[in-house]
Amino acid sequence: MPAEKSIYDPNPAISQNAYISSFEEYQKFYQESLDNPAEFWSRVAKQFHWETPADQDKFLKYNFNISKGPISIKWMEGASTNLCYNLLDRNVRNGLGDQIAYYWEGNHPDDYSRGLTYRKLLEEVCRFANVLKDHGIRKGDRVSIYMPMILELPIAMLACARIGAVHSIVFAGFSPDSLAERMFDCKAKLLITADGAWRGEKPLYLKALCDTALEKVEEMGHSVEKCIVVSHLKRVTPCQPDHVEEEIPWTDDRDYWWHEEMEDKEPACYPEWMDAEDPLFMLYTSGSTGKPKGVLHTTAGYLLYAATTFKIVFDYKPGDIYWCTADVGWITGHTYVVYGPLANGATSVIFEGTPFFPGNDRYWSVIDKYKVTQFYTAPTAIRALMKFGEGPVLKHNLSGLKVLGSVGEPINPEAWLWYYKYIGKEQCSIVDTFWQTETGGHVITPLPGATPMKPGSASFPFFGVKPTLLDECGIEIKGEGEGYLVFSQPWPGMMRTLYNNHERFEDTYFSKFPGYYCTGDGARRDADGYLWITGRVDDMLNVSGHLMSTAEVESVLTEHPRVAESAVVSRPHPVKGECLYCFITPNENEVFDQKLISDLKKMVRERIGPFAMPDVIQNAPGLPKTRSGKIMRRVLRKIAVNDRNVGDTSTLADEQIVEQLFANRPVEAK
C-alpha cells in the first residue's frame, strides 16, 4: 500500500464544475468564514425564507469559556422561520413540485417506489401534521420515533418540524430498554413506529418491542399517551419461505394505525413560525458515564449548516441522484438523508435493506438502478464488501458516480484505496468526513473539486470551523503534532445544550479546556497541515460506526448474578473497525464457563442492541487497578491485542495480575 504521503488530486472534470473548484478558492472562503462569520453565514441565509429577518447585530453571540459565565451559542437571534416550510413549500414554489424528493428501495429488491415528489411529500407531511395536532401535539412537545427506513419516517420528522414539535428518533436496532430510557428522559407524549420490518431474511417485530418499552417507561413513572403505527409488513415481500406473520399486539385507545388516521386529513397545514433558537430535534448519543445524552439542535443554525455542508461537500447539482446508506436513527440520517438534501431540492434514495441481501452486490445494484451520482456510506460497509473482491462490483454500471463519501469512523488507507479504485474507478473524489452528533454536520472534510486527497485523512476544516490541537495541559500544538481535537469558535449547526441538563453539557464539552469545545477525539496534523483523526481519548467505543460507552456495556455485564466486576475495552477489528473485548471477574465460588459467556452476550444484545454484542469475553480473576482503585484501561487494551509492552505498571496495587491476564487470553482472541 502507498505511504501516507501519497496524494490524489481531484479529477479535473469534477473541479471544473465544482462549487469550490480549487484549494486556493477553499482557503479564501474559509478565511472569510473565520474572520467574519456573521457576514459569511448571512449570505447563506439569503436563499431561505425568514418570516422575521435576523438582526445583523445579533447574528452571532456566544461564550465558550466556562470561567466567564454559562456556555451559550446563539445564531440569528430574533429571526423566525419554519424548517419544513424551507424544505418543502419553498421548493414547490420555486418550481420543484414535480421533482422526485425520494426513491424508496425496500429490503427486498421487488419492493420499491417509483418516487415521491416534493408536492406529494408536502401534502403527506401536512396530513400527518394534522394527525399529530388532532392527538394533542403542540409546539415544544416531544415525539419519539422508532421506525424502519420507510418514507413515513421523513414524513413524521417533517410533520413535527411543521408544527414545532421536537422529534426524538431512536434507532430501531436499539433494545426496548434503550427506547424506554430515552422516552422517559425526554418525557415523550407520543410514539410513532411500524408493525415491523425485514432486515435481510430476519423479521423485526417493532410494535412488540415498543409495547415492552411503553410498559417499562410506565414503570419508570411516565406515560406515553399515544402510539401511531405504520402497517408495513403486509405491503412488502416476506424474505423467508413459508413465513407466518406474528399477531401485532394492540391496545385500544392508545394505539392507532397511520393509514386510518391519515384518511380524512387535509393536505394543508399552516406552519408554526419558530424562533431561530427554538429546538428542532433531540438525538441521544452515548455518554462516557453510561447515561445517554439528549443532544439538542435548534432551528436556524442547523438549517444553514445542514444545507451548506450537503451542497458543498457532496457538490450536489440539479439532476444528480444522491444516496446515503445511513439509518435515520443516527445523526448522519438526520442531516444527510433528510434535512440537508431536502434543503437543496435534491433527489435521494432511501434504502431499507442491507449490503448483503439478497446478494453481496446489493449496494452496487442500487447505484446502477437509480444512476446514483453521490454515494455516502461507512468504512465498516466498505471493509465488509472488500472481502468479496471486484466480482460483485463488475456486474453493475457505476459510471455515474462523481463523489464517494465515508462517515462514522476513520477510514483505513486500504479501504480508502479500494473504494477509490474499484468503486470510483479512480475518477471520483472521496470525502472522508469527520463530525459528530453534537456538531450537526461535517466539521473536517475534503471538498470534491478542491482538496488533494490523502487516503485515511479527513484533511481540512469546513467553513466556520476552527480546529486546534492541545496537549494534556491545554497548550496549543502548532504545526506537526498530535493532541486533543478542540474547536475555538462555534459554527451554526453545533448543538446548543443537552436536553434538561445544561450542567452536563458544560461539564462534558467545555470544562476540560476552558474556551474550547472538546470533541473527545484525538487528531494528528501532518507536515502538510492535513488532519488525521486518531480516535476517542475518553472511555468510548466505536463499533461499526456505533458510538457507545464502556460504562454502558459494563453496567449490563455486572447485572448478571454471577459477575462481580467487569471492564470493557476496544480492540481493532478488520471489518467493524473496533470490537468489544470484555474482562469478567466472576463472583466468589462461581465458575467462568461457556454458559456465562453466552448469557452475557445475550444480555448485552437485548439490553443495548445487536451492534453492541462483545466479540471476546475473557476470564479475569482480578483487574489491573491502581492503589486508589482505578482500573488501568491502557493495560487491558494491551492485553486485548497481546502486546506485552504494557509500559510502567509500578502504580498497580498488584502487578502480578497483568501476567495472569495475558495467560488467560482465550483461544478466539489469539
Swiss-Prot record:
Enzyme class, UniProt record, top EC level: ligase
Record PANTHER family: ACETYL-COENZYME A SYNTHETASE
Keywords: ATP-binding, Cytoplasm, Ligase, Nucleotide-binding
Enzyme nomenclature, EC number: 6.2.1.1
GO molecular function, one term: ATP binding
InterPro entries recorded: Ac_CoA_lig, ACAS_N, AMP-bd_C, AMP-bd_C_sf, AMP-binding_CS, AMP-dep_synth/lig_dom, ANL_N_sf
Function: Activates acetate so that it can be used for lipid synthesis or for energy generation.
Reaction equation(s) it catalyzes: acetate + ATP + CoA = acetyl-CoA + AMP + diphosphate
Protein name, UniProt field: Acetyl-coenzyme A synthetase
Alphabetical GO biological process terms: acetyl-CoA biosynthetic process; acetyl-CoA biosynthetic process from acetate; behavioral response to ethanol; photoreceptor cell maintenance
